Amino acid sequence: MLRRDFLKYSVALGVASALPLWSRAAFAAERPALPIPDLLTADASNRMQLIVKAGQSTFAGKNATTWGYNGNLLGPAVQLHKGKSVTVDIHNQLAEDTTLHWHGLEIPGIVDGGPQGIIPAGGTRTVTFTPEQRAATCWIHPHKHGKTGRQVAMGLAGLVLIEDDEIRKLRLPKQWGIDDVPVIIQDKRFSADGQIDYQLDIMTAAVGWFGDTLLTNGAIYPQHSAPKGWLRLRLLNGCNARSLNIAASDNRPLYVIASDGGLLAEPVKVTELPLLMGERFEVLVDISDGKAFDLVTLPVSQMGMAIAPFDKPHPVMRIQPLRITASGTLPDTLTTMPALPSLEGLTVRNLKLSMDPRLDMMGMQMLMKKYGAQAMSGMDHDSMNAHMQGGNMGHGEMDHGNMDHSGMNHGAMGNMNHGGKFDFHNANFINGQVFDMNKPMFAAQKGRHERWVISGVGDMMLHPFHIHGTQFRILSENGKAPAAHRTGWKDTVRVEGGISEVLVKFDHDAPKEHAYMAHCHLLEHEDTGMMLGFTV
């Protein structure tokens, strides 16, 4: 533990006398300290600056070019307050265009930062908005169509912390970087010379880009020393394509207190916590026993994601309790969730997620050729059979029965298996259509609830489906009632071979030029067409 960290703890906890407790055992030097992003707050005139730039980072002793917001890698934690307007100047110092999307924020389309909110290379974009939503852990990342996966892989991601009066009154752990700790989890693949090795090709367009190295806040298997008592972890799955399943190595429980859009009604006790790409959960864990343990991710049954070293529980970070104790608590109740309104007479939108069968077949072949049988480890046999037959399926894989034909582009469908030129950049679909930035698929009405029915039937891939401009409630997830910790405010829902239904409402405008997006948050699916724009 570095001296400055030690002083930070001593000052924060008022324990100058803790110095003699510095033992070699407690602060084993072999693990890097968990990097803690700086808090970025608005200045006296309610402004803040974000600079998108290239830098250098070191992984396993090798230097790599990385991208970050206000630094070499990742970014600060942007602190916002409910009801308080903020102006953000975003300077793009990269040699290519980017955008900055406020993931999870309920703000107008013009400031949402989707693929239309281009910040040119060397240019600046200024956005002003007022968060009117409840306290939540959200995030920022790029959203340049066709390049989102690469720009995120290069390191662009940062947390957004929305605060409000309600959460301040709860006695939750709230000492930033001490007992209130951000945990941004990402996998990376590196080339032999240590550079981030990103490709968008047929294999990654099918299963996503995944790596064999896990980073936590940009460090490999770091350690965090925290005071005994309740430790609050703000978990973000910042991976391009890998779903996670978070647990404690000694099986101690995690108490989920918040999902994407804020507090749950009451804590939910779990021993493992699946985390889809783009999702956030806040958990409290009791470390008052003083025993060190690892936060780990358990193997998942997702195509290609149980390849070593992820075929076994894999450490995310080490948690080392200190001898001093912090004062945060786990409340019995957290907030009041509004009752779900009647679903009678609501506009229903049917969205069907699918992949060109040729991409499915060729992607699987490349995956098997590269990784052999372990590419399929953890997959159940039904999924595997569906994939293996995928290449011969042609139109059979498309389930026309459940489709909302109004959104279908039958021309594009007709080309699919009739000698149409295959282009993997346009091989993932919603309602049979590839994303078109200039053609929003529909117009939602402001302030009105809608029921969205999102189907992955006939496609066994995992699709974490994310909707911009809203925090919704899950009515059913992949054909089942949502788990208790997924009944709160969400912006991402699991679609995996089944049907999920969500209740959405949009309280801000999104004109055609700055439409909201709805898309798969497996970034390579998004970049190759599985996205739609809609207006409000």
From Swiss-Prot:
It catalyses: 4 Cu(+) + O2 + 4 H(+) = 4 Cu(2+) + 2 H2O. Keywords: Copper, Metal-binding, Oxidoreductase, Periplasm, Repeat, Signal. Cu cation 4 binds at H463, C520, H525. Its main location: periplasm. The gene is cueO. Residues 1-28 form the signal peptide. Cu cation 1 binds at H101, H466. One of its GO terms (cellular component) is outer membrane-bounded periplasmic space. Its EC number is 1.16.3.4. Binds 4 Cu cations per monomer. Monomer. Cu cation 2 binds at H103, H141, H521. Its cofactor is Cu cation. Residues 53-165, 229-295, 424-536 form the Plastocyanin-like domain. This is Multicopper oxidase CueO. Predicted to be exported by the Tat system. The position of the signal peptide cleavage has not been experimentally proven. Disruption phenotype: Mutant is very sensitive to copper after copper shock. Causes a moderate defect in aerobic growth on CuSO(4), strongly impairs survival during anaerobic growth on CuSO(4). InterPro entries: Cu-oxidase-like_N (IPR011707), Cu-oxidase_C (IPR011706), Cu-oxidase_fam (IPR045087), Cu_oxidase_Cu_BS (IPR002355), Cupredoxin (IPR008972), TAT_signal (IPR006311). It is an enzyme of class 1 (oxidoreductase). Induction: By CueR, at increased levels of cytoplasmic cuprous ions. The keyword Signal applies. PANTHER family: BILIRUBIN OXIDASE, CUPREDOXIN SUPERFAMILY PROTEIN. Belongs to the multicopper oxidase family.
